[in-house]
Amino acid sequence: MIQQQTLLKVADNSGAKEIMCIRVLGGSKRKFGNIGDVIVASVKSATPGGVVKKGDVVKAVVVRSVKGVRRADGSYIKFDENAAVIIKDDKQPRGTRIFGPVARELRDKEFTKILSLAPEVL
């Protein structure tokens, strides 16, 4: 469950290490986001020489969440950390590599490029 002020680890090589959620997109009353939701975030820490810098406002898609998401067969999938991938306006990732597993629910939201770059899809 991602809300305002939530810190997320960045799971790509765009240069950011940690981001903080500013807003969950998808309606003015929307308070929480989960796997597959797009958020607006601020970069809190970054590596030198990266594409994004500290203080940049970016869009990101949540790929791992501590709060589980329920699947159609009744099972739940949850992770040990909250993580996101920084994206462009056309839903393409800014980085060229994805680190760690991602959830299969991203396919329903049409983030196929992230799924193809990920080392493991759960």
UniProtKB/Swiss-Prot annotation:
Alphabetized Pfam families for the sequence: Ribosomal_L14 (PF00238)
Signal sequence range: none
GO molecular function terms noted in the UniProt entry: large ribosomal subunit rRNA binding; structural constituent of ribosome
Keyword Signal found: no
Gene Ontology biological-process annotations: translation
GO cellular component: a single term: cytosolic large ribosomal subunit
Keywords in alphabetical order: Ribonucleoprotein, Ribosomal protein, RNA-binding, rRNA-binding
Keyword check for Zinc: no
PROSITE patterns: RIBOSOMAL_L14
UniProt function note: Binds to 23S rRNA. Forms part of two intersubunit bridges in the 70S ribosome.
Quaternary data: Part of the 50S ribosomal subunit. Forms a cluster with proteins L3 and L19. In the 70S ribosome, L14 and L19 interact and together make contacts with the 16S rRNA in bridges B5 and B8.
Family assignment from sequence similarity: Belongs to the universal ribosomal protein uL14 family.
Protein name (record): Large ribosomal subunit protein uL14
Natural source organism: Clostridium beijerinckii (strain ATCC 51743 / NCIMB 8052)
Classification of source organism: Bacteria, Bacillati, Bacillota, Clostridia, Eubacteriales
Name of the gene this protein is made from: rplN
